[in-house]
């Protein structure tokens, strides 16, 4: 009889563990899908359309940009980064340049209101005639928070240059 109780207890605990794991996995997939649609797709859209205000709206008011991919290792408010990027958005909106950004991820962790996303972004910029001005792959980490039903960037960390091979490995 003790063996039966032990067996049933073990079976019940296993069932509960599997059920919890499946529920967590489904919640993770839902969060990732929501972030893909409402955050990363919005970043890509705003860059492509030159929608500066739309891009700015994806950032938390206290967001920080960290860059260690070039010679100058820096950390500063996203508002400063946005001021530096604004002309590129305006040029894109006016058709003077064509910009595009894509994202791929190697790790995505979080819960209902926080997310830490690790991956690579691929940015291209062409002039109005289609000539390539800039192209680059960059390792990225982003810390996101969900406020009032909207995912916002709290910290973007542009870590290091990546290669096309690194990018392809994340397919």
Give each language-model segment a name.
Residues 107-115, 144-151:
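A short, structured loop/turn motif at beta-sheet edges
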Residues 59, 69, 119-121, 157-158:
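A mature extracytoplasmic/lumenal domain signature
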Residues 21-57, 170-171:
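Short, low-complexity N-terminal intrinsically disordered segments enriched in polar/charged residues
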Residues 30-34, 38, 52-113, 132-135:
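A solvent-exposed, acidic/Ser-Thr-rich amphipathic alpha-helical stretch
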Residues 1-27:
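Bacterial Sec-dependent N-terminal signal peptides
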Residues 27, 128-134, 163-169:
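A short acidic/glycine-rich loop-to-helix N-cap element
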Residues 64, 119-126:
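Generic short beta-strand segments
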Residues 137-168:
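Short beta-strand edge/turn micro-motifs at domain boundaries
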């Amino acid at each position: 009889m003790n063996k039966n109780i032990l067996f049933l207890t073990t079976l019940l605990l296993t069932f509960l563990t599997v059920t919890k794991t499946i529920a967590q996995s489904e919640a993770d997939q839902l969060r990732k899908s929501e972030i893909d649609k409402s955050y990363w797709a919005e970043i890509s859209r705003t860059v492509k359309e030159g929608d500066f205000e739309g891009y700015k709206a994806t950032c938390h008011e206290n967001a920080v940009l960290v860059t260690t991919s070039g010679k100058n290792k820096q950390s500063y408010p996203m508002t400063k980064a946005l001021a530096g990027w604004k002309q590129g958005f305006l040029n894109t909106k006016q058709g003077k340049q064509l910009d595009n950004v894509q994202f791929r991820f190697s790790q995505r962790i979080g819960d209902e209101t926080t997310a830490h996303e690790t991956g690579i972004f691929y940015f291209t910029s062409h002039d109005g005639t289609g000539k390539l001005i800039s192209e680059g792959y960059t390792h990225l980490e982003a810390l996101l928070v969900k406020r009032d039903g909207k995912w916002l960037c709290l910290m973007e960390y542009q870590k290091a240059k990546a290669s096309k091979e690194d990018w392809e490995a994340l397919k």
